[in-house]
Structures are given as structure tokens and as C-alpha cells.
Amino acid sequence: MLSKNVANGGLTASPFLLALTLSLGAAVSLGITRFAYGLLLPPMRADLGWTYTLAGSMNTSNALGYFVGALMTPWLMRRLNAASVMVIGALLASLFMGLSGFFTDSTMLLVQRWLAGVASAWVFITGGVLATRLGALDPSRSGLLIGLYYGGSGIGITLSALLVPTLLNQLGAAQKWHGYANWAWAWWALALLCVIASLVLIAPARAMRPLMTTSTSRESHHRQFRIADFGFALAGYTMFGVGYIGYMTFVIALLREQGASANQIMIFYALLGVACMASFRVWAGLLDRHKSGRALATLNVLLGVATILPALTSAWPVVLLSGIVFGGVFLSVVASTTALIRHNLSAHDWPAGISAFTVVFAAGQIIGPMIVGWIADSAAPVAGASDADGLARGLIFSAMALWLGALFASRQKALQQAP
């Protein structure tokens, strides 16, 4: 059974429990550090007088940091170990989140978002490596364990949804508390959540250190990682990065422009997070069955549908459906690439494979927010166009990027294993 304690690789704890606690790394690195900014974008833009292009560039800067962090992670893991890098990254991400509340200068905020991106890449990649190692202990349920880790981002999303709108509403948009705007206090509250989660991560990180020295000779029949072998999947994942981040950055701003109340936004974002947490159960079988790019392609198609819905209508049931489907799919796309690597590579090459996919993922995220922000701003000079019209056009672009990614991923074949 998955719930029983196992001794494989020196572990004495339940793989399920370890994956669950490791999921707090995904909560910190993506659920809060990356995605909570979408909740803070509207009040920060209103208070600081930003354009949508500048607002989008904050997540572009975060993605640039993530890109650099992804390049650094294999080097760090060779000198430390995945578990230590994860905890250090989580604590640093918490620090940089907190510092964001002290600045109003856009340059300084861009720097803080960049630093948080570097640290969050360390956390997310190393957590993915550890979750993949756990999956190797129970191959029949590896998709479940990997999906559980990535679904942890939903914990961060849900907590952010419950915390940020409530705090902003309590403090008021026009008033400052002890000299700081309401959004600054929201940054500090989110940083506190990250600190708590980071401290909880210490125990599972210690428990999993034996896995990082486990022999992988039994998997020597797998091929080594080569970029050319995964070209279509890497292209598909790049377009996923371009498309999904536009939604996560600007959908709250679109809902605000469409007249959604603070309570409606809280419900929408919380349901998105809950769906994300539940998604590991829904897609585990798909990830386990397919060794090709089929899972990545299927999930990108569904994600494109969820992304385009709020751009086509502001009907509340449809908007809620969009959030639930998006939350139930988007991090399973990430898990699908990890599963693809596990199916086709030896454990020795998992870190290299995960890092390569993370790099192209980050590259896509660098492009996405600025393009969507530019599209939203470019609608302003058009007669009769509103901010909502511009943001809707941006989400249509995001959906198209996701569908293009699905087309690429559908061409990815499973690798022929070495004898």
C-alpha cells in the first residue's frame, strides 16, 4: 500500500506523506511567490499608476529570475543536495517576498521579483526531483506522487485567495496603515505564510536525503538525456509557459474590470486553488499510461479552453468553470513533463531533464506577461475599447499559445530504450 512505511533507498517514512509535505515547496515557489501577485496587481497598479505592460513586466522579471535559478540549480545540487537547496531556496523566497512590501519604486520591485524568481526555481526544481525519486519507489503510483507534489501549488493559491482579498478589504484601498499601503501588508502576510511552510519543509527534506545517494544501476537501460530527443515536448512546454502565465497574471484584473466583487474574486481564486490540489487524483492515470507527449498535448488543449472562456463572456457560471478547469489542469501539465522524463530517462539524468524543461518553461513565462500586457495597453487608443477588452484580447492570445503548444507536444514520441 502507498500509505505504509517503506525502507527503499533508506526511507522509513510514507512516500505519500513525504510527497504531501514536499508539496509545500510547490506552494511557496509557485502558489504564493509566483501566482499571488495576480491578486496584488490591481491595487498596486491603481496605487502606483502602472500601465498593464509594466504590471506584466513584474512577472516577466520573476520569470527571468526563475530562468537564471533553473540554470543554477543543477550546479547547486552537485555541491549540496536537492533537499538542502530546496529549504534554502524556500527561506530566501520568503525573505524576498517580504522585502517587496517595503518598496514603491518600480525598479526595486522588479529586482525583488527577480530575486524571488531565482529562489523559487531552486525550490520547484529540487522538489520535482525529490518527488520523482519518491515515484521511483512505487512505479505503479508514481503519477499520483508526482502530481501530489505539483498540486501543492494549489495550497498556496487557496491560502492566497483567502488571505489577500480579505486583508485588502479590511485595510481599505485609500488608507495607509502605519504609513504603508494595503498591498504592502499583503506582501508581508504572504511572506509569513512562506516562512511557516519553509520551516515545515525541513523535516521531509532531512528524511529524503538518503534518496539522493541511492544507486540507480537497475535503471541503466534508460537512455541518457539529449535535448534533441525531447524537441517537440520542449517546444510544447515553452508555449505552455507563454500561455498559462498570461491567465494567472491578468485574469483577476480582467474580472475586476468586468465588475466582479471582492468576494467573487476570492471564491474564484480559492476554487482554482482547490481544483489544483485535487488534480493529482484526476490525471495520475494519464501520466502513468503515456510515455509520449500525449498527456502534455491533451492538457494543453483543455487549458486553452479554460483560458479563453473569460475572454468570451463575463457570465459568472462560465467564469467559475474557467477557474475550476484551469486549476484542475495547469500544474498537471508540469507534472506531465516530469512523468515524461521519468518514463524515458535513467534516474541519474532526471535532474538534467527536469532542469531543461524548467528552462524552456521559464523562457515562455518571460515572454507571456509582457505580450499580454502590451496587448491590453494597445487596446486603449481604439475607440470604444475598455481595459476589459484589452485584457480579453490578451487571454485569447494566451489560449492560442496553449493550443500551439498542444500541437507541438502531440508530435513527441516515446524514446526507444537502450538495450
Residue positions per predicted region:
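Extracytoplasmic gate region of multi-pass secondary transporters
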Residues: 37-38, 229-270, 274-277
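Helix-breaking motifs and short loop linkers at transmembrane-helix boundaries and internal kinks
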Residues: 49, 81, 102-108, 291, ...
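Structural signature of the two symmetry-related core transmembrane helices
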Residues: 84-98, 294-309
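Paired small-residue
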Residues: 96, 107-115, 317-325
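Cytoplasmic helix-loop-helix junction between adjacent transmembrane helices
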Residues: 112-152
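A late C-terminal transmembrane helix in Major Facilitator Superfamily
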Residues: 344-381
